[in-house]
Structure formats: C-alpha cells, structure tokens
Regions:
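Kelch-like beta-propeller repeat domains
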Residues: 1-371
C-alpha cells in the first residue's frame, strides 16, 4: 500500500491530516482514496478529539440582512423570497472560541427558497439535521428532512417525518446518531402527544410511545440519556403555556412521570437549554439555572444584557458557558453574548462577541456541535 504522504511515515502523515481544519475536509477527501478512507474512519475523529483538535461550532438558522444579502447571498441574487416578503433564512456558523462567522453552503437543489421558516435543527456527530418548518414560498407545513455532512461538504435529503405534518414541535439529539421529535400541532391546530426518533445513519424513523400530555410549542433538550420535553400547551389551552415537563428514557424506551413544576406558568420554554450541570433559561431580564440535584427551583445566575433581551436564542456551550443571541428592539440587529463560568464568588461575566452586519439577523433555531 502506498504511503499516505510520500516520504513520511504513516503515523506522521496521520498527525498532519488530523490537523486539517474542518472547512478543508471536503478538499482532503477528494485527493485520493486513501485520504478519503482515512477521514471517514472513526479512528481519525477519535484522534482529533483526544488531541483537542475538535472545534466547537454553533449552527444558527438565521435570516439574511437586506443590506448584505445582495452581495453575499445566492438566495437573494435569485430573488427567492418568502411569500410574506421576509428575507430568506440560511444556516450560519459561529466559532465561539475564535469569534469567526461563516455560512454553510446553500442547497439550491433541495432548499431553493432558503431554510424552512420555523424549522428545527439538531447535530449528530459530524452532521447537521434540519427538520420540518414551513415552506417559505407557500407557508405550508413541511415534513422534509435535510442533512448537511461536514465531512463531505454536501447536503442530502433524509427520510421525511412520518405522521401528520407538524409545526412547533420539540426536537433534540443525543449528539451521536439519533434525533428525537415530540409534540407540536397538526394542520388543524390540534396539539400532539406523539413522538418519534430518527436514526441519521440508517435514515430511518421509529415511533415512540405517546407523551402523557399534548404539547404544542414545547421545547426539547437531551440530557443524561433522556429526551426532555418542556412546557407547551394543549389544544384547549392554546397559547397558555404550562409549567410541566416529561422525559423519555432512551435506554428504557419509556416516559418518566410528568414533572409538574418544571417551569413557571406562562413562560415560553423556547430558551430552555441543557448545560453541563443542569438547565438554563432566559427570562425577560435574567438567565436562570436549575441544577441536577433534583430541586425544582430556578435561580438567577446573571442579568441578561439589554442588547439581547428581545427574542433571545440560547445555546449551551462546552465548559459551562452559555451563548445568547437576541435584539434590543423589535426589528433591530441581533447581538451575541457569551456567559462565562463562575470564577470563585464573583458574578459570572459576560463576553460580547463581535457580530458582522451580515450575521445580525433574527435567529429562529440553533444547536451546538463539535467537529
């Protein structure tokens, strides 16, 4: 067998390949069969992870800004707009450690009008999964699934979500290969109890037992081997958010008893995310935390910066950090702040991340992954 890199021992060549930044994966794979097999091997990614070479990325389904879209967006150049006249959504990437922003390649063959409105996003391994939402050209609910592979640099279609086309459902992944979906509402505005799981590698959906309660506009997080579905409301109480949650044990394949006091009544669960040691959420003025000790009390841990208090979108980052993207006023540009871990007894500090104008649009969904 030929060496990976002529003139170098294979162990040295592998060390070189593992240091290629993720945007270069596609080019490296195209060099030769040996390099492609090397990058596709589990050992390659284990070496990267073990050597601290992985990169933390935040993927954001974000609207394009009118002032910048004309110069940077193929979607805008093709004049693809939602029927409402709003700017199209695309997938933006942010590296919190370097502060750099970028776009994922567009998928004109699969998503000619941009990302679906109100879609959900989840990360599994080196793939990013986009699920459901509304067709931007018709506002019809979609059951489509699209997958971006960071290794190949390509988009592909996944198996569509089975059952009634649902909107505003809970969604989360185990970060490995499975995406969970639950609740939402059907085309008749009926809140749903049904749930299912999607195996990304097999491209297969499997039904899960129904939840105990109907949950429209609920939030999904994955923590401690369980898919936690928080809040939402029933058909009869439309728009009146409840405070309970229930969790699906992925190993035992059953739902836990309903936790009746997961949230304060009337609080939208959109900003609820799972951190290293518990759950975070954003109120109108603070970030609150609920630990894993079993207590139901939410405690304020930091005041929310005024620049991100409107329509905040929260993302838990490795190392006990929390990223919040939001605006100071309706229709205003979105800012980005990162809440750093506690340093002794001092208040947890915020670090403001620079946001270029073209990445200051509204964020409708987000997730964190490591490549």
């Amino acid at each position: 067998m030929d060496p990976l890199i002529p003139g170098l021992p294979d162990d040295v060549a592998r060390a070189c390949l593992t240091r290629v930044p993720y945007p270069g994966f596609r080019a490296v794979r195209s060099v030769c069969k040996q390099w492609r097999e090397e990058l596709e091997s589990p050992a390659f990614h284990e070496v990267r992870r073990g050597g601290g070479l992985n990169r933390t990325l935040v993927a954001l389904a974000q609207s394009e800004q009118p002032s910048s879209a004309a110069s940077v967006s193929p979607l805008h150049k093709n004049h693809h707009r939602a029927s409402s006249g709003t700017m199209p959504y695309r997938m933006a990437l942010f590296e919190p450690d370097s502060g750099t922003w970028d776009d994922l390649p567009t998928a004109p063959d699969h998503l000619p009008h941009g990302l679906p409105l109100f879609c959900q996003v989840a990360a599994t391994g080196r793939t990013l999964v986009v699920l459901g939402g509304w067709d931007p050209s018709s506002w019809a609910a979609s059951d489509e699934v699209f997958i971006y592979d960071f290794l190949s640099g390509d988009w592909r279609r996944g198996a569509p979500m089975p059952g009634p086309r649902r909107s505003f459902f809970a969604c989360a992944s185990d970060s490995h290969r499975t995406v969970y979906v639950a609740g939402g509402h059907d085309d008749e505005k009926n809140a749903l109890r049904s749930a299912m799981a999607y195996d990304v590698e097999r491209d297969e959906w499997a039904p899960l037992p129904d939840m105990a309660k109907e949950r429209d506009e609920c939030k999904g997080v994955f923590r401690g081997g369980a898919f936690l579905v928080v809040g939402g409301y029933s058909t009869e109480t439309q728009g009146q958010f409840g405070k309970c949650s229930e969790a699906f044990d992925a190993a035992a394949r059953r739902w836990s008893p309903v936790d009746e006091d997961a949230l304060a009544t009337g609080l939208c669960p959109r900003t609820c995310v799972a951190g290293d040691e518990g759950l975070y959420r954003c109120t109108s003025s603070h970030v609150e935390f609920r630990g894993d000790s079993g207590e139901s009390t939410w405690l304020p841990v930091a005041e929310l910066p005024e620049e991100v208090r409107l329509a905040p979108c929260a993302v838990a980052l490795p190392g006990g950090r929390l990223m919040v993207v939001g605006s100071a006023c309706h229709g205003g540009p979105h800012s980005c702040y990162i809440l750093e871990p506690a340093d002794g007894k001092r208040p947890r500090p915020w670090r403001r991340a620079a946001v270029p104008e073209e990445y200051s649009g509204h964020v409708q969904a987000s997730c964190c992954l490591q490549i």
